[in-house]
Design a protein with these regions (language model features):
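DNA-contacting interfaces and partner/effector-binding or oligomerization modules
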Residues: 1-59, 64
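Short, charged, surface-exposed hinge/linker loops at domain edges
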Residues: 2-5, 45-98, 102-115, 120, ...
């Protein structure tokens, strides 16, 4: 039997980050919270494990899922702002740094096409970095 894959969105919140499951036909839902993205994902994983245990204790069938984490654009930009300048991200993604600033501060939302452009640029940059070897 194939496991369902569920999208889990990671977003910046007032006190850190939150992770939540996309609308699903499941009988349960999980969330995670933390001061960092890493803490948030770890908290989500704990919540998923606790949900599985709860179902086992109550004798209810638990539908195992596979989940993938997705950033919203503003949260990604906020998380990595200390590592990348907007000018640097413009060179990597091809998206104007003024627009990136609007996305970072929530003044505008990028179109789906722009989100894909940002994601493709970041992934290409990551591939380039992972291929490097230092002498």
């Amino acid at each position: 039997m194939n496991m369902k894959t569920v999208k889990v969105y990671v977003e910046k919140s007032e006190y850190g980050y939150s992770a939540y499951m996309d609308d699903t036909p499941l009988d349960y839902s999980c969330i995670g919270e933390g001061k960092t993205v890493e803490e948030t994902i770890a908290d989500f994983n704990v919540a998923y494990g606790e949900m599985r245990e709860h179902y086992a204790k109550t004798g209810k069938p638990f539908e195992e899922i596979r989940y993938e984490f997705y950033y919203d654009t503003a949260s990604f930009l906020q998380e990595y702002a200390p590592a990348f300048s907007l000018a640097g991200l413009e060179r990597i993604t091809g998206v104007n740094q003024t627009m990136l600033g609007h996305y970072l501060h929530g003044r505008r939302k990028p179109s789906k096409k722009t989100v894909e452009k940002i994601e493709q640029g970041i992934k290409a940059f990551a591939r380039d970095l992972s291929a490097l070897h230092f002498a």
